[in-house]
Amino acid sequence: MPKREITFTVKLPIRSVWSFMIDRKEVGCLFPGCKGVTILNDLDSIWMIKMSLGPFSRTIEMHAHTEEMVTNERIVWTATHEHLLTSGIITFRKVSEEETEITYHIEGHVTGHFTFLQDIVIAEKLGEVTRGFMKAIKERLEWTASSEP
């Protein structure tokens, strides 16, 4: 199963980072290709994502489920769509009173025919999406930090 992980720090208290990261609509709008997030309940949501691979693109519904949420520590989730399974964990570590380290780990897997070949493609796409998503999150958090009094 292809995996990607990115770690970065932001100059914000952990409580501010946590508050932002648990807002699925706010975070969802930063995910590359996300066209909207529908909150179903405290643990479940549907993310409409436009996936592109070369000249082909398709909008899919990813059904996301929060498996575990420990305040100011971690969020564990899974998301599925037909033959696509993803899972991830976001961990938060207090570096200082005003700085937080965020680690984003994601795994993706395609089921069905030609799984091995599809996983090769998914591995590349996962890296691209992860870098874009974490860059957008870091920029938004840094903007938030610069806007605080």
Language model: regions and residue ranges:
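Short amphipathic alpha-helical signal-transduction/dimerization elements
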Residues: 126, 130-145
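Extended beta-strand/beta-hairpin segments
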Residues: 3-4, 50-51, 94-101, 105-107, ...
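Short, surface-exposed coil-to-beta transition loops
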Residues: 3-5, 59-63, 84-89
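Short strand-connecting beta-turns/loops that link adjacent beta-strands
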Residues: 13, 42, 71, 95-99
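Hydrophobic pocket/interface hotspot
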Residues: 17-21, 27, 45-47, 66, ...
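Hydrophobic ligand-binding cavity/cleft-lining segments
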Residues: 1-44
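Glycine-rich portal/gate segments that line the openings of hydrophobic small-molecule binding cavities
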Residues: 38-81, 136, 148
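Beta-strand/loop substructures that line and gate deep hydrophobic ligand-binding cavities in soluble
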Residues: 80-128
